[in-house]
Amino acid sequence: MKQTLLFILLALVGIAPTMGQNALNAKADNIVGTYTGTKNDDRFKARITRQADDTYKAQVFWVENDRDEDGNKILDRKNPDKSLRNTPCDRIVLFSGLQYNKEDQCWDGTKIYDPHRGIRAKMKAWFTKDGRLCIKGTLFGICESVYWQRLP
């Protein structure tokens, strides 16, 4: 009885990562596109592109509230890389070097940048059943997920 229960439990653990996924996770280039998302009540649009080395990069190209109180473009002042602190908020690279993991049918292998906090976290991305792109960031064992909606 214990062996049967253990077998069922192990089988469920093996199936769990694929539950809720859809066909969009089956091909690496399905992630390429334009998305909209929200972070801390700030709406933005980002574009994911395939790079020459077969990895993927996401860059913001529009932010709803991109100006400060004085009308100046908001800059990436919290970036830990001092050379990037003058980057306008609508040009921030959120991640690069993202790789497709064919076995797990997801994208991983890089870090995502959170410009609100000025931190980079290990990331994993996949499409949910309803077609949204789920991006999960993990830092020191703490996880946070955001959902991006593909634009037509």
Predicted regions and their residues:
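Sec-dependent N-terminal signal peptides
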Residues: 4-13
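C-terminal segment of classical bacterial N-terminal signal peptides
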Residues: 13-21
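N-terminal helix-cap/turn-to-beta initiation motif at the start of protein domains
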Residues: 21-34
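Short, exposed beta-strand-loop hairpins at the edges of beta-sheets
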Residues: 116-117, 122-126, 132-146
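Short beta-strand-to-coil "C-cap" segments at the C-terminal boundary of structured domains/repeats
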Residues: 147-152
